[in-house]
Amino acid sequence: MNVIPTRTDRPDLRNFPDFLILGPQRTGTTWLFFNLHLHPEILLHRMKETYFFSTLGKPEHPHFRYPCLEDYLGSFDERFWERLKKHYICLRKSLSVYRPKIHGEATASYALLPEEVIAEIVACKPGIKGIIMLRDPVERAWSHAKKTLVRGSSEPVGFEKFREYFESTGQRQRADYPSMIAAWKRHLAPVHLYLGRYDRIVSAPSPFLEDVERFLGVTTKALFFNRHLTIKLNPTSDASMPEDIRRFLEDLLANDIDAYRRILSDIGDGRAV
């Protein structure tokens, strides 16, 4: 491999994830992570946001944790007490034994991975699946700005600060759903990329979760749903979007909004592509 660092020429890939929740940020990935976390047939990494593939070769990055692939794969190993706890919870909730069939993890920055990284991920696990969540670009951008600029700040944030944030390259990329979808589709096997709708988390959480579980190939039962089904996770402040910011975003993201609506028209309630 040229991009993903390894200690050996033939690393043990048994722990390589079977699926990745790709993001982007503020689209419901935390909700999805916690609602899949205790499914008896899924071993989901204990940590939401491992950042492994996003921080390759960047030891100075604040989220850098795993120097090489073997370290990352080793982090999927469950401690005895973790496995025992999952056995107990699964038996209590659904009379099911915790017996994971698939591994997965969720890092919302993976939606924007360079294609050379995506290609090596798929080379490691040709059958890997990905999930991209779709949210109205204006609402997603505002939610992300509240989390980044407003949360924990004692000072009011002015329009110019918001404008600078929204016009940044990273934020523009996160609104460009067609590009992130195309990049992953070019490398994943056919129908191994699921496009999910953020609004279904609110309007139809149970059917949406069932759709995701069917896509992943695990058993779907209402008994497997947990208390997080109707809980808003990782929320930002309730501050409503000022009209001047809404108008600015609607103008800035006009093409992205049109593309988003076309995608929704194509996928309906969500589907694999």
Feature-to-residue mapping (PLM):
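Soluble or luminal CAZymes and related metallo-dependent hydrolases
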Residues: F64-D71, F80, S109-E116, R172-M180, ...
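The conserved 3'-phosphoadenosine-5'-phosphosulfate
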Residues: M47-K48, R135, A182-V273
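Structured helix-beta-strand junction loops
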Residues: H39, G127, N255-D256
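PAPS-dependent sulfotransferase catalytic core
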Residues: M1-K101, A106-T107, C124, V138, ...
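Surface-exposed cleft-lining segments at the edges of enzyme active sites
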Residues: E105-Y110, E160-R172, D199, L233-R247
